UniProtKB/Swiss-Prot annotation:
Name of the protein described by the UniProt record: Tetraacyldisaccharide 4'-kinase
Residue sites binding ATP per the record: 51-58
Gene Ontology CC annotations of this record: plasma membrane
Ribonucleoprotein as UniProt keyword: no
EC number assigned by the record: 2.7.1.130
Similarity comment: Belongs to the LpxK family.
InterPro entries: LpxK, P-loop_NTPase
Purpose of the protein: Transfers the gamma-phosphate of ATP to the 4'-position of a tetraacyldisaccharide 1-phosphate intermediate (termed DS-1-P) to form tetraacyldisaccharide 1,4'-bis-phosphate (lipid IVA).
Amino acid sequence: MSSLPLQKSLYPLLRPLGAAYRVLMRARRRRYENGAACGTDVPCVSVGNIGWGGSGKTPVVQWLLQWAAVHGLHAVVLTRGYKASPPGLPYVVTPQSSAAHAGDEPLMLARSCPQATVVVDPVRSRSARWAQERLAPDFFVLDDGFQHVQVARDTDLVLLKKDDLHAEWGRVLPAGSWREGPEALSRAAAFCIKCGSGEFSGLVPDFENRLGSFGVPVFGFSLRPGALIPVCGAHEGAQLPAGAPYVLFSGVGDPAQVAVTVSSFLGYDPVRHHVFADHHGYTQADMDRMAGYGLPLVCTPKDAVKLTAPCGVPVWTLSLETNFHSVWNAQPPAGQAGEGFAQWWQCRWQRLAGLR
């Protein structure tokens, strides 16, 4: 999500407040860098962003968890669990948990990556210590961890939106969407930007101008549709009839991208796209209103985990896979020019594991 229209119109007035917030965030970080952060006994990887909005953090976390499962490693995700109301803290999310207890994204991760453990706790230094004692992790993943200072980390994967390289560059809250100033990007081990493979080359001048001085790779990724999976109102293995009209609904950070992805996968647009706020909790009234069209419904996996009310009509979700497709590096190390994300991460992991 980019700056709001009011922020843009009031930017000259809000800019001094943004500068003050930027200084405050720097001072806060220095305090923890001087020894107040909680260390961990195993490698810790943060996946976060510089600003607010849907930059694709959860798909990148999911990629790391799937990589860990393939390599026989136990990954533990430390997440605050936005809008979660767990019965106790720390709270271990299971595939059987409710979205109300776990939060939508933690529950989605727990269901899609059962070999990993997802722990919800807004105090992540507490959940890190608790998990080290009880869960035998091979490494931690800090979800939305770039500005989180309580837990020390070995690697920061920083996600950027295309707007971050243009109009949003350096606009710190409340003057823009950024949580810190551009100097914070020097902490990044790599940048990841969600874009189509055809868009990536057009962004290279921005990488050179904005990110080249940091000397780390920039990886492009997209969400590749997998299959339509019935959620309710249709038996397992059922298929949406080819060409059948449908209604799309989503409560995510980038609804426009959802519409593009679903329409491209099915080959035609929905009759209607109901857009809800990010992390929206679906009510019976919501489902009744959408079922009133008498058409099948399609949603994202993040929406699907929150469907507890009777649907009234068949509902499908479109499974998505994280696809790293491009890389740019101003100064690639010897032998690493054009190295893809999987290869880069494998080398990074070997170094991290060797230091412990």
